[in-house]
Amino acid sequence: MSESDPNHEIVVARLMRQLHGFAQGLGLDRETTRGIVDRVIADMPLAPDDDRLARARNWMLIASA
């Protein structure tokens, strides 16, 4: 799924909404979280959201260290 794909923004919004509290708890800003979400979607275009969320949370933990 490319960033020019209209579904990309829908998926980004959905994942960002679900990761908002986790990101805040780690002290990550919106731009950092968005970059992680974009990367997860690019790396896992056909994966279900649960798998994407797990990967994003792992990367967010690393980014906050």
PLM segments and residue spans:
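A short, charge-rich alpha-helical start-of-domain segment used by transcription regulators
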Residues: 1-21, 45, 49-50
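Hydrophobic-face residues of short alpha-helical interaction/recognition segments
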Residues: 19, 23, 56, 60-65
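Conserved RNAP core-binding helix
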Residues: 30-47
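Short, aromatic/basic-enriched loop-to-helix "N-cap" motif that marks the start
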Residues: 35, 47-62
